[in-house]
Design a protein with these regions (language model features):
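Long, charge-dense tracts
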Residues: 11-112
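Short, flexible loop segments at boundaries between secondary-structure elements
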Residues: 273-297
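Active-site catalytic motif of lipid deacylating hydrolases and related acyltransferases
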Residues: 77-151, 155-247, 286-289, 294, ...
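Extracellular, luminal, or virion-exposed ectodomains of exported proteins
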Residues: 1-21, 26-31, 37, 121-154, ...
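Hydrolases whose catalytic domains are alpha/beta-hydrolase-1, hotdog thioesterase
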Residues: 259-263
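Short, surface-exposed basic-aromatic patches at helix termini and helix-loop junctions that form
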Residues: 192, 242-243, 264-274, 294-301
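Long, compositionally biased low-complexity segments enriched in polar/charged residues
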Residues: 10-12, 17-19, 156-161, 165, ...
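Gly/Ala-rich beta-loop-alpha elbow adjacent to hydrolase catalytic centers
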Residues: 252-256
Length: 386
């Protein structure tokens, strides 16, 4: 029996898989599997998606008797010469540090795998995960923002810190084609637009990484007919927030709306309510009727779901919310400003939060897009939006 006088990092308890009929405690190689109390407490605090990642890695370790290809030491020294705790196995964005001998496998620690979190030189190498982002300046995007103000928005939100749970009052899910550095400031801008009076000084970003345009589009389709890994991960985060009684104000942009919609549907399928949670969706690629139905069923409060520029093809056409001939014509003429990378971001009808047609027209004129501004002015009276 373990002595309670030992620190939690050295107290061992049997490790059990939390589902009926599946135990890691002893396998055919005859080794018992233990975990330190400290590591077990860390494990219990993870959300369900993270736990499954850990148990999947543990299953592989146990099946190999602790001496498989997942063992770091096996590549550099014989088994008999292995030091006690040099074995590390990856479980998603987590690392497991474990020890092994002829009788036991011991999970010594679980923690973030710092080599796979954070910005990467190649955006497609980034992983989905949570980051706490802090405000660096008081610059906020409004109808009065000048071109100079807009240029400073990229510095308004600063360093991102990888975390394993949402502990801030606000959280966000970014859209497609965003690397982590872009997502951290852009979703801060959308957060301000959605919850202006809160004047948030920090928020948690659930980073939806980009794998390239084609793969991102495939992921959007996947969440409309099935469920992507990112949506499943977000569903576990929502459940974790609810379990810990944390009322979070969410904001989602573009593909983030599709992911959030599907995640809530997955939560609904489990019979779990999300009372206390709030969401605002900006320029979402999701079908609004489907999202509204899912949110109502979950008890989720919708703060805003209609912040869409009528010239933006993402919510109107890709989201299937307005397939009228006039909508198709409007979106067609402005599509190049959505997908083009050389245009100032304030000229895009999609990137920044939609504030008003007058604001959009002003930015088009200031940046020399006179033809587009005239087209928008012609449509303005018919649309009835100022």
């Amino acid at each position: 029996m373990q002595e309670r006088t030992l620190p939690p990092s050295h107290q061992l308890i049997p490790l059990e898989y939390p589902q009926t009929g599946w135990s890691l405690r002893r396998k055919r190689h005859g080794k018992q599997v233990f975990i330190t109390r400290e590591a077990n407490q860390f494990l219990l605090n993870l959300n369900d998606y993270q736990k499954n990642e850990v148990y999947r890695a543990l299953s592989k370790i146990v099946a190999e008797g602790g001496y498989g290809l997942t063992s770091g030491g096996l590549k550099t020294r014989p088994m008999a010469m292995r030091s006690k705790t040099d074995a590390i196995a990856a479980a998603g964005i987590l690392n497991l540090v474990y020890s092994v001998n002829s009788e036991k496998i011991v999970v010594n620690a679980i923690g973030l795998n710092k080599s796979v979190v954070g910005p990467m030189p190649v955006a497609s190498k980034e992983r989905a995960g949570l980051y706490e982002v802090t405000r660096e300046s008081n610059v906020r995007y409004s109808k009065q923002s000048s071109s100079a103000d807009i240029q400073t928005l990229t510095k308004a939100w600063g360093h991102q810190r990888p975390v394993l749970e949402v502990s801030t009052a606000h959280a966000a899910v970014n859209g497609m084609q965003n690397d982590l550095l872009k997502a951290r400031w852009l979703m801060g801008v959308h957060l301000d637009a959605a919850y202006w009076n809160d004047a948030a000084d920090k928020y948690t970003l659930f980073h939806n990484p980009t794998a390239g345009f084609v793969q991102d589009v495939f992921e959007c389709i996947q969440d409309k007919v099935g469920a992507s890994k990112v949506a499943k991960q977000l569903a576990a985060i929502l459940i974790d927030c609810q379990r810990k009684k944390r009322a979070i104000k969410w904001v989602c942009h573009s593909q983030g709306g599709i992911i959030f919609n599907r995640a809530v549907e997955l939560v609904n399928d489990m019979g779990i309510r999300l009372e206390g949670q709030k969401v605002a969706i900006h320029a979402g690629g999701n079908k609004k009727e489907r999202a509204t139905e899912a949110f109502e069923r979950a008890g989720l409060e919708v703060v805003d779901i209609d912040r869409d520029n009528p010239f933006d093809f993402v919510p109107n056409l890709a989201g299937g919310n307005n397939w009228s001939w006039s909508s198709i014509r409007r979106c067609y003429h402005f599509a190049k400003l959505v997908v083009g990378k050389q245009n100032p971001m304030q000229t895009s009808p999609h990137t920044l939060p939609f504030l008003s047609l007058e604001t959009s027209i002003r930015h088009l004129q200031l940046n020399g897009y006179d033809d587009e501004a005239k087209r928008m002015i012609r449509e303005q009276s018919r649309l009835g939006k100022c």
